[in-house]
Amino acid sequence: MFFPRTSQRLLGAIFILLTIIPAAGAATPLHKVVFVFAGFNERTGYIFVAKDLRFFEEQGLDAQIVQVRNGQVAVSALAANEAQFYSVSATGASLGAMAAGLDLAFIAGIVNKLDGDFVVAPKIAAPADLKGKFIGIQSIGGGVWTFTMLALDHWGLVPERDKIQFRIVGDQAVLAQGLISGTVDAAYLGYTFSKVVQRQGFRVLQDLAKVDIPYQGVGIVARRSFLDQSPDVAERALKAIAKSVAYFQDAANKQSVVNILMKWLRLPQVDDAVAGQEAMRTLYSKRIFPTVEGVRNTVRILSRIDAKFAKLKAEDLVDERIVRKLERDGVFK
């Protein structure tokens, strides 16, 4: 077909324009954010899912997911603005930084109660049998220590009085090995690693989710100064998280979630990942508001070991501005 020269030039211009527009759109840079976490278990699965399924990218974010050795390292990363978000429980590390004046706040709550298994050696039949025993933890004041202290408090046990000793072992993969080797007599474990040691003859003294202890089990912490400066970035990040939680809770996505957990947690058997997926599917909160009552419960426990925590008010440690906006926008429906 013949086109006049003017028409040919016009078509050429249109072609160039149509090729430039998608290229410009594709070249739009993603905004980099860093999520840090210390606990190595299924509780962080919502971040793994959001990363692997590109929910962050859908929100224009290049999310880097970084595991750190402990809460102190994570808090230092936030303080230095090397990370923007910290997936964490209400612990001595996170609340300690708040007590010291760092402008941190819980901006979302993913699990709002204590959960996980308190796993013990076969010789331990009841909570009273923990007296005089060694309990494995990751760090004093960290997540596993806090979970353990809340469980002991529930059972009326006091470490000093009952001669219960804490032994710093490592993250949950290492804690599981510590139980198997006999280094410790008991330890808090998430459901995936609990399954691993149960196959070795260890028993679950208590599934802590069944005793309904209020706690900010999994939350997201950020600096208030970051929220003030970049509220849109925080909003987009929490939108991706909310979508991940909803995906996690949909039974139709079970196999996809299991595969993601197996990859990130390097689990040896599918059953271990299934245990984590099933637990988090019911424990994750679709309406991702932080729990003031759960934070208050931790402040109470921490005040026993350090008076600096007694001055904290739980209401001052949460910032709901982003999740309230998401709720108004219908994100949690």
What are the language-model segments listed below?
Residues F2-G12:
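Bacterial N-terminal signal peptides that target proteins for export
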Residues L11-P22:
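Bacterial N-terminal signal peptides
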Residues I21, F48, L95, M149, ...:
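Predominant activation on well-ordered alpha-helical scaffold segments within soluble catalytic domains
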Residues A27-D171, L175-S181, D185-Y191, L205-L208, ...:
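Short, glycine-/small- and polar/acidic-enriched structural segments
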Residues A83, S87, M280-G294, K325-V331:
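Short amphipathic alpha-helical segments at helix boundaries and their inter-helical linkers
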Residues G92, A173-L265:
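Pocket-lining segment of extracytoplasmic ligand-binding domains
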Residues D228-A310:
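Secondary-structure end/capping motifs
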Residues V299-K333:
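Conserved C-terminal helix/tail region of periplasmic/extracytoplasmic solute-binding proteins
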